[in-house]
Amino acid sequence: MKWLIVTADDFGASCGINRGIVQAHREGILTAASLLVNRPASEEAAALGRECLSMSLGVHLELDADDPERVPAQLERQLARFQELVRAAPTHVDSHHDVHRDPRVLPHLLAWTGRAGVPVRGHSRVRHLRKFYGQWGGETHLEQIGVEGLLRLLDAEVREGVTELNCHPGYVEPGFRSSYAGEREVELRTLCDHRVHQAILDREIRLIGFRDLRRAEGL
C-alpha cells in the first residue's frame, strides 16, 4: 500500500498563509500542518488547527544552528509554547529551512523526540519528499508546482510505504516578506485541483495524517 502525508510548512507565518493552509486541507489533499509558534499569526493558526480535527498538527521549529548551546533552551521553549497554543502534543516535528538536519542541532532534537515518540522529518520510517517546491538557483519554476509537476512526482517518488510530501501553500498579503511568495498561491491551487485528487485515487494512494501512522505501518 502507498500512503501519503501532505504537510504544509509555515502555519502561523501570516493570516494569509493560515487561510491558504486551512483551504488546502478542507478543499484539497493537505493532511497535516507544521506550526510556527512565535509569529504574530501563531495564535490564529493554532485556533484554526484545533477546528480542523482531521488535520495533524506538528511543530515547525525555528532554531539557531550557529549557536548550538542555545538550541536545547530554544527547543524546550517552542515545544512548551506549542502545548500552550494547541493544548496537545505535536504529532510530528520539523523545522524552518530544515535547520534540524544540521549535525549541531539534530542530536538535541532526537533526544527529545526519542523520549516522546514523535517522528522527526527525515529521521523516521516516513520517507520525505521535498521536491514539490517552485524555486531553485535563484529562479522560479512554477512548472514544478503545477498540476502536471505534482502528478510527475506522484508517479516517480511515491512508493510502497509512507511518504511525506511537504508544501508551502498560502495567500500572499501586502507586507508578507519572503523570497518564496507568489509560488505559494500556485501551490494552493494545485493542492485543491480536482485532477490531483482524482490522480491519487487512480494510483491507489491513500491520504493519511501523522495520527494514522501506527495503522499505516502495521504497528
Regions found by a protein language model. Give the residues of each.
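Boundary/entry segment of secreted carbohydrate-active catalytic domains
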Residues: 1-15
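Structural preference for beta-strand elements that scaffold enzyme active sites
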Residues: 3-5, 30-34, 54-60, 90-92, ...
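Active-site beta-loop-alpha junctions enriched in small/polar residues
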Residues: 9-11, 36-38, 60-64, 96-98, ...
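Acidic-and-aromatic substrate-binding clefts and catalytic sites of carbohydrate-active enzymes
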Residues: 11-15, 35-44, 64-71, 96-105, ...
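Acidic (Asp/Glu)-rich catalytic clusters
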Residues: 21-27, 42-58, 80-86, 156-159
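Active-site gating/metal-coordination segments in enzymes
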Residues: 61-92
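Catalytic domains of cell-wall/extracellular-matrix polysaccharide-remodeling enzymes
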Residues: 81-158
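C-terminal domain-boundary segment and adjacent tail
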Residues: 178-219
